Amino acid sequence: MTYVGAAEALRFPALEKVTGSMEITTSFVNGMYPTMLEEIYTPVLKRVGKLVMTSRANDETQYNTTITDLDCFSALERVDVIDIHKQGGLVSFKGLEKAIGSLDDEMSWLVGGNAYNPTFEEAKAGKLVKP
């Protein structure tokens, strides 16, 4: 499942499972200005193989700054890989707390280029919000 586009919101009210990769591009540069995804709604999503959030931006000034937390994934219980990059406003991973418990090792935690980038050890220890 891949989303690359310019919608303000992605809403999947009945989606419970993605067996493969769920890839969400949160900002898309069309011409000179980026369009940013503002909302992700997945209230019953319990399982994802690989969760990817990234941006098609070329530089930090075009990273998504509207998504500040991942509370949209608070129902997520199991994920094999979390890969989140280029989220300039992201300061809280608290919504992934249950899913982080299912991760096996630091190779399953790929995080960087965000406003907050907890290490695998910090995430497992519950340090999910930027101090």
Protein language model regions, located:
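Concave beta-strand-loop units of leucine-rich repeat
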Residues: 1-131
